[in-house]
């Protein structure tokens, strides 16, 4: 992957040529629980397609009787692993596994405590960070290592957690500023690593080889308005990035929310 170059107007071009290939709408926007369930099924189907799974599965909704927002998934051999959001609660970023995308078991957490340096995380002096903490994780597997990343507005940082045994640990932790909102990270075939993040306007940057931070000078605007395929009146900009590469093409999935409309999944391809 080559990062887009800056144009003379100060705007950035997209990676190769990136354009919307799908706009998927689900659920009644006032029913958050149903939206989560349907998005979970949609993501399962998309990941299954990308990995060459049979198109049909038998399942009964809801798959999980719990709040499982912002899910990210990866398949390793015959096992699927999924991470989710825990916000202010600890331990954080639950890791679940399944053999069939239907029956899920909680097997681990990426971290025990996010930080001890922020008084609000410890409820000191009547402070709290309710609903904040860590959001929208991303889970990946690369060369024998499991990677889980997340970010926190509470601390202003991005976090990577790494382990060779996702169920038993131990986990190695790397953190850096800034807090890269709703990011997805990607190990490309050329050995370079990337982070895509943002809300509405999406950015891409190359990561240091050891994931210790963003490489200086590599941040570019990937999509000026990733919500555009869903219309012009948007109340929630495109976020929740998840990037996959299938048959030489990159597919970027985002969720957006048109005003007076339904939550919408937008897919761009490069």
Q: What residues fall within each predicted segment?
A:
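Carbohydrate-active catalytic/glycan-binding domains of CAZyme proteins
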Residues: 55-270
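Cationic, low-complexity basic patches in intrinsically disordered or flexible, solvent-exposed regions
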Residues: 6-7, 13-14, 29
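Methionine residue identity
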Residues: 1, 11-12
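Bacterial Sec-dependent N-terminal signal peptides
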Residues: 23-57
């Amino acid at each position: 992957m080559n990062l887009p170059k800056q144009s003379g107007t100060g705007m950035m071009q997209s990676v190769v040529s990136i354009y919307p290939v799908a706009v998927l709408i689900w659920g009644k926007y006032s029913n958050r629980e149903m939206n989560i369930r349907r998005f979970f099924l949609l993501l399962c189907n998309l990941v299954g397609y990308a990995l060459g799974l049979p198109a049909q599965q038998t399942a009964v909704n809801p798959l999980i009787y719990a709040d499982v927002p912002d899910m990210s998934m990866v398949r390793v051999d015959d096992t699927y692993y999924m991470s989710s959001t825990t916000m202010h609660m600890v331990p954080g970023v639950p890791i679940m596994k399944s053999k069939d995308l239907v029956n899920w078991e909680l097997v681990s957490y990426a971290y025990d405590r996010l930080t001890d340096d922020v008084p609000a995380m410890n409820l000191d002096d009547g402070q709290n960070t309710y609903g904040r903490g860590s959001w929208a994780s991303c889970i990946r597997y690369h060369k024998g290592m499991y990677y889980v990343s997340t970010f926190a507005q509470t601390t202003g940082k991005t976090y990577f957690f790494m382990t060779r045994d996702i169920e038993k640990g131990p986990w190695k932790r790397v953190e850096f500023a800034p807090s890269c909102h709703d990011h997805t990270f990607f190990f490309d075939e050329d050995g370079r690593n990337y982070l895509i993040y943002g809300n509405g306007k999406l950015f891409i940057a190359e990561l240091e080889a050891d994931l210790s931070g963003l490489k200086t000078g590599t941040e570019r605007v990937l999509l000026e308005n990733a919500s555009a395929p869903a219309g012009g009146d948007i109340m929630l900009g495109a976020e929740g990035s998840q990037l996959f590469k299938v048959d030489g093409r990159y597919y970027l999935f985002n969720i957006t929310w048109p005003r007076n409309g339904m939550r919408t999944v937008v897919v761009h391809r490069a």
